[in-house]
A protein has these predicted regions:
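Peripheral (non-transmembrane) domains and long loops of multi-pass membrane proteins
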Residues: 1-138
Length: 138
């Protein structure tokens, strides 16, 4: 006979999807190597503090809200990447901007502060905003 295994693992909440997939593959491989009678393993990866809340806006809706919120703030027009983390019934927002946007650490701090304040006032479900300045352009 064949043995099917269904495993749920909890991972640190801020890891990337690709890292979660890598962890799942390592678990799957480890189980099938250690127990040859296992024919298939399904690994479910969940954030340790992952709680589904249907009142939270989805990505499309949230990005539209942020676009409205930041439309009058020129630095926001340079956002390279936006990552969302749905955790504990709220949203943690991660925004990446080009390093060249700020001419000094003080200016970078001011840009970050204004983006955070506007986002958290406009979208009450946002609990945290992290603004990153990067030299990457992709």
């Amino acid at each position: 006979g064949s043995v099917l295994v269904d495993v749920h693992i909890a991972v640190e909440s801020m890891i990337t999807v690709s890292e979660g997939h890598q962890i799942a593959e390592q678990v799957r491989f480890g189980l099938t190597e250690q127990f040859p009678e296992i024919s298939d393993v399904v690994v479910h990866v969940d954030a340790e503090d992952d709680v589904f809340d249907d009142s939270l806006p989805d990505r499309g809706e949230l990005l539209r809200l942020l676009e409205q919120c930041w439309k009058e703030y020129p630095p926001a027009q340079n956002i390279l990447r936006t990552n969302l983390h749905y955790l504990n019934g709220s949203i943690r927002l991660e925004v990446c901007l080009p390093f060249t946007l700020a001419s000094s650490p003080a200016e970078a701090s001011e840009i970050a502060y204004k983006l955070k304040r506007r986002a958290m006032e406009f979208v009450p479900q946002i609990a945290q905003v992290q603004v990153l300045f990067t030299t990457d352009d992709d």
